[in-house]
Amino acid sequence: MGGISVWQLLIIAVIVVLLFGTKKLRGIGGDLGGAVKGFKKAMSEDEPAKKDDKDADFEPKSLEEQQKKEAAPESKKDKEQA
């Protein structure tokens, strides 16, 4: 109805091949593939640099450990006040 059928795509492909020729299309495909490969390589080289960046030199602690440390001084304060 409003979509492009397989036959219409096939006719468009034949027209493109007739206009540009197979050598030119092969060259364009190779150039496009090389560009995509180069882009992927650049992105993969950039990933390890992001993973190595740290904000500080200390080990992350769990929430439970932090709560235990904070709770210990509070209990001492409560005992001293009583």
UniProtKB/Swiss-Prot annotation:
InterPro entries, sorted: TatA/B/E (IPR003369), TatA/E (IPR006312)
Sequence ranges of Basic and acidic residues compositional bias: 42-82
Region (Disordered): 41-82
Superkingdom: Bacteria
One Pfam family from the record: TatA_B_E
Topology within the bilayer: Single-pass membrane protein
The entry's keywords: Cell inner membrane, Cell membrane, Membrane, Protein transport, Translocation, Transmembrane, Transmembrane helix, Transport
CC per GO annotation: TAT protein transport complex
A GO biological process held by the record: protein transport by the Tat complex
Compartment(s) of residence: Cell inner membrane
Gene Ontology MF, one: protein transmembrane transporter activity
Signal sequence residues: none
Residue ranges crossing the lipid bilayer per the database entry: 1-21
Annotated HAMAP family: TatA_E (MF_00236)
Subunit structure: The Tat system comprises two distinct complexes: a TatABC complex, containing multiple copies of TatA, TatB and TatC subunits, and a separate TatA complex, containing only TatA subunits. Substrates initially bind to the TatABC complex, which probably triggers association of the separate TatA complex to form the active translocon.
Similarity field: Belongs to the TatA/E family.
Protein purpose: Part of the twin-arginine translocation (Tat) system that transports large folded proteins containing a characteristic twin-arginine motif in their signal peptide across membranes. TatA could form the protein-conducting channel of the Tat system.
PANTHER family according to UniProt: SEC-INDEPENDENT PROTEIN TRANSLOCASE PROTEIN TATA
NCBIfam families: PRK02958.1 (NF002813), PRK04598.1 (NF003396), tatAE (TIGR01411)
Name under which the protein is recorded: Sec-independent protein translocase protein TatA
Species assigned in the record: Vibrio campbellii (strain ATCC BAA-1116)
